[in-house]
Amino acid sequence: MSKKISARQWLVYIIIGLIGQVAWVIENMYLNTYIFSFGVGESYSTYISITNAASAIVAVLTTMLLGTLSDKIGKRKFFISVGYILWGISTLSFGFIKVTTIQGLFGLEALSAAKTAAVLVIVLDCIMTFFGSTSNDAAFNAYVTETTDSG
């Protein structure tokens, strides 16, 4: 006998699912433009390639490892809740990476500060991807599968 999914549960699926997709859109659409805006010169494409490759590697490894961990522990709501909160914080943190701030903090020339900012974006993108893959790819997708009826 199948269990009917309530309107409230559908709303949770939709809202959490959309929030996750918005965060991925920010990463996939805007980080390229953000790095370009730093003025890293002709090395722009190199930084974008590294960003995409590193993020993909982190996403695959995190989804496999943390998905397995959430399967074993069985606390998907915890992984979803904490992961989404940390994912949001890490996404918002991109706004604090500014070339002028790096110049002021470290006394770097403009191009060196721009390249440092690009590296910080790559590192923060990997951190953001870790939280996003944990909460959305590993835990949320499995939670939806577990709580819905395929028949």
Protein language model annotation of sequence segments:
Residues 2-58:
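Helix-loop boundary and gating motifs at the non-cytosolic
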Residues 10, 14, 49, 104-105, ...:
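The feature captures the transmembrane alpha-helix scaffold of multi-pass secondary transporters
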Residues 48-70, 84-96:
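Central cavity-lining transmembrane alpha-helices of secondary-active solute carriers
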